[in-house]
Amino acid sequence: MMKKSYKRKKGPVQSKKITYDGIKFASGLERYMYMALKKAKIKAKYEGQTFELIPSFEFDLESIERQSNGKGEYKNRGNKKILNIKYTPDFIGKDFIIETKGRANESFPLRWKLFKRLLTEKFDPLWTLYKPQNQKECDETIKLILQKQNT
């Protein structure tokens, strides 16, 4: 009897990790953006700053549930510290932030909204946000940044 081979189910977002210039990029689109910024001589740091969207807190109530992955025993998982939620944009420059996003994962839309709220409430209107989703939009982002720098 032949044993069936099963393919492991992958999540909806499959980006390939790529190393370029000694930097490990999470996707080919991030590398493309890096190369475009470098070619245009626009200074930006890759994953240069992490922002805390929601601080950690103590959860002192009971919470009857399984583990967050849906496995494990259905029991009290409350009365513990809840970790903070952080966000690290792909590129950060003097007056811009770029988040390259081919296909958003499940948590990204919420993080992006929380990030926009944080920028609105805690920072001067210093940055312009760009979220290119393909190489054409990366090229357009470069043009827009250069136009802003020349005005």
Residue ranges with predicted function:
Residues 1-151:
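Electrostatic, structured charged patches in enzyme active sites and in nucleic-acid/phosphate-binding
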